[in-house]
């Protein structure tokens, strides 16, 4: 089985979000199962110089972008057993950020065509092209409507993964002819038209052989108007070709037993050593080293989608529970400013780091007692899985992947890995924090919850097995896809 992953970002080369983690980890697990998986992404100017120096140019071609002809170089790099291909065009990709440019429609129209055009040139004929998010959404559409007439492409299948339905790649109608070389007949509700515009995401949803998303619950949610971002009707129509497969985490990177960033290594059998990491974290942030005061952590984008407005609404009540709070992230100015103000209001209780540091994130996971993630919606979420791996008990809203990964603690059976609430409501969240706080006082029960959380397997191995099944079933044409 030959699979080409096409992504707009990938660890360790360039990252803005969770997509990069998936693109970095899942191919490695698929390779362990015997799949010939390769990854293709743009050669951004932001890729570190030492990595760019290792790339080898293997092909040059010309790609159509409307009436223009644009240069395309293909560079190759072997990294940790995986072959990576980089689409090189400095005009499009040598920028100071990955996204958010006035010509993103043109940049990713070019990228989608470049991916398809280069395959015969580099002599790689994948069975499956696995595309991720809107940046690659036109690949399944162009393959179906144009490239499949060529025998080289005729047997290829496409899988499209929705990482976040909110970001859809919506552009003016003129993009069809000007950039995509497509006629106006495709500006229709059956094809690319989306409320008077062209949607790259919709292009993939109408044309991919199979659609996946990153958790079983999110798969169900996006078929409803509340979560469906105006695409719920289309997703319901394609529900027989829609599968939810939970993301994993890289359990080598996130391993408290071997983590080079934390003060003291520990695992589920030496869980008492976590308290040393807590003390180190408190000292790092110049907080009082109080063992009996729980540290609640937030490692997140500071946005309304992540539920930060709920936290803001009842922040004073949370601190009144006699807790310490540490926040790491960047986002909307409203929340950055609020949390910075709260460090002045509660100098012995609150710390915030506006920015992101991988090392500090690891130290927070290792030192925190609780991990707060009250998202409005969460396709999968990695933070709660990392937190459980480190014994930081998650407090989450029952949505998307949070619902699939965190089992709410049952005081009768003593089963569970965290605490959950259903409604997107600040006081429901506050009550859940208070409930967690009460069990924190019961050390034996709290240790049970921590151990149960740390014992869960959220590695990529299970997910990779399901994707491999999916590819096999797709190529077999059975029409019966993996059960979640």
From Swiss-Prot:
Swiss-Prot/TrEMBL keywords: Glycogen biosynthesis, Glycosyltransferase, Transferase
Catalytic activity: [(1->4)-alpha-D-glucosyl](n) + ADP-alpha-D-glucose = [(1->4)-alpha-D-glucosyl](n+1) + ADP + H(+)
Residues reported in the UniProt entry to bind ADP-alpha-D-glucose: 15
Domain of life: Bacteria
Signal peptide positions (record): none
Pathway: Glycan biosynthesis; glycogen biosynthesis
SUPFAM superfamilies reported in the protein's UniProt record: UDP-Glycosyltransferase/glycogen phosphorylase
Stored Gene3D superfamilies: Glycogen Phosphorylase B
Disulfide feature: none
InterPro entries attached to this UniProt entry: Glyco_trans_1, GS/SS, Starch_synth_cat_dom
Record GO terms (molecular function): alpha-1,4-glucan glucosyltransferase (ADP-glucose donor) activity; alpha-1,4-glucan glucosyltransferase (UDP-glucose donor) activity
One GO biological process term: glycogen biosynthetic process
Sequence similarity: Belongs to the glycosyltransferase 1 family. Bacterial/plant glycogen synthase subfamily.
Record's function text: Synthesizes alpha-1,4-glucan chains using ADP-glucose.
PANTHER family in UniProt: ALPHA AMYLASE DOMAIN-CONTAINING PROTEIN, GRANULE-BOUND STARCH SYNTHASE 1, CHLOROPLASTIC/AMYLOPLASTIC
The protein's name in its UniProt record: Glycogen synthase
Gene name of the encoded protein: glgA
């Amino acid at each position: 089985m030959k699979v080409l992953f096409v992504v707009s970002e990938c660890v360790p080369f360039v990252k803005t979000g969770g997509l990069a983690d998936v693109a970095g980890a899942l191919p490695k697990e698929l390779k362990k199962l015997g799949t010939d998986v390769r990854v293709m992404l743009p050669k951004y100017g932001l890729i570190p110089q030492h990595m760019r120096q290792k790339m080898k140019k293997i092909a040059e071609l010309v790609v159509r972008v409307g009436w223009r002809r644009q240069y395309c170089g293909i560079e190759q790099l072997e990294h940790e057993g995986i072959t990576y291909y980089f689409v090189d065009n400095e005009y499009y990709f040598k920028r100071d950020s990955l996204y958010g440019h006035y010509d993103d429609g043109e940049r990713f129209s070019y990228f989608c065509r470049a991916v398809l055009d280069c395959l015969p040139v580099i002599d790689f004929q994948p069975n499956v092209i696995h595309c991720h998010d809107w940046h690659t959404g036109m690949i399944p559409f162009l393959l179906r409507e144009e490239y499949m007439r060529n025998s080289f492409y005729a047997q290829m299948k496409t899988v499209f993964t929705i990482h976040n339905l909110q970001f859809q790649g919506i552009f003016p109608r003129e993009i069809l002819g000007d950039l995509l070389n497509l006629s106006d007949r495709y500006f229709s509700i059956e094809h690319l038209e989306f409320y008077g515009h062209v949607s790259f995401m919709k292009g993939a949803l109408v044309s991919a052989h199979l659609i996946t998303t990153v958790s079983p619950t999110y798969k169900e949610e996006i078929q409803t108007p509340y979560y469906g971002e105006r695409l719920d009707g289309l997703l319901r129509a394609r529900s027989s070709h829609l599968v939810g497969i939970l993301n994993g985490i890289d359990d080598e990177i996130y391993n408290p037993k071997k983590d080079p960033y934390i003060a003291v290594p520990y695992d589920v059998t030496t869980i008492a050593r976590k308290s040393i990491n807590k003390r180190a974290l408190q000292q790092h942030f110049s907080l009082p080293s109080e063992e009996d005061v729980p540290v609640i952590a937030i490692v997140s984008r500071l946005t309304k989608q992540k539920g930060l407005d709920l936290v803001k609404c009842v922040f004073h009540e949370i601190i009144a529970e006699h807790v310490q709070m540490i926040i790491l992230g960047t986002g909307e100015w409203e929340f950055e400013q609020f949390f910075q103000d709260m460090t002045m209001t509660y100098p012995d209780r609150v710390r915030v780091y506006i920015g992101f540091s991988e090392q500090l994130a690891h130290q927070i996971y290792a030192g925190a007692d609780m991990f707060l993630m009250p998202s409005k919606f969460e396709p999968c979420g990695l933070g709660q899985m990392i937190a459980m791996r480190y014994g930081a008990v998650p407090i989450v809203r029952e949505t998307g992947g949070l619902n699939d990964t965190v089992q709410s603690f049952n005081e009768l059976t003593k089963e569970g890995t965290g605490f959950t609430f259903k409604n997107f409501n600040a006081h429901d969240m506050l009550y859940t924090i208070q409930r967690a706080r009460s069990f924190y006082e019961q050390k034996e029960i709290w240790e049970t919850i921590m151990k149960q959380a740390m014992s869960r397997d959220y590695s990529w191995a299970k997910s990779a097995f399901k994707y491999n099944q999916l590819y096999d079933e797709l190529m077999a044409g059975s029409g019966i896809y993996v059960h979640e």
